[in-house]
């Protein structure tokens, strides 16, 4: 029912940990994970398009492998599509406006919502704010 696609340039242990997290947190039995090793030979859009064309399922999740999802997110995602058959896509972060170009940051201003806390291993941590400071975390279904 669900295909999860991600691009990686991380080590094997990191990817193993991420796959285990997806498997334990998704909350459904019918899913596939498509991992694409990518050392800058393809754009992220090319990887996602490749995964979508190779997917065996009608619901596809394009995800970064450095996030964590709450337990049961797959059930919630399926329910969202079941309750809203006119939905074609559900997103987590970025913008409340999607320009024709597909470049979400093209018109940042008031359309951007959210903040991203960066924590690269062995490097300085920082916060990117795409909107005013949020009073609390915003619960989401998927990315």
Language-model segments: residues:
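N-proximal low-complexity "stem/linker" segments adjacent to membrane-targeting elements
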Residues: 1-24, 32-35
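Short alpha-helix within the catalytic core of nucleotide-sugar-dependent glycosyltransferases
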Residues: 19, 49, 57, 71-82
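A short beta-strand-loop structural module common to alpha/beta enzyme folds
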Residues: 30-42
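Glycine-rich, basic loop-to-helix element that forms the pyrophosphate-binding segment
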Residues: 39-55
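Conserved donor NDP-sugar-binding/catalytic core segment of glycosyltransferases
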Residues: 41, 72-112
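Short aromatic/hydrophobic "clamp" motif used to bind/position activated sugar donors
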Residues: 60
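The conserved acidic donor/metal-binding loop of glycosyltransferases
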Residues: 64-68
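A recurrent flexible, glycine/aromatic-enriched loop bordering the glycosyltransferase active site
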Residues: 122-143
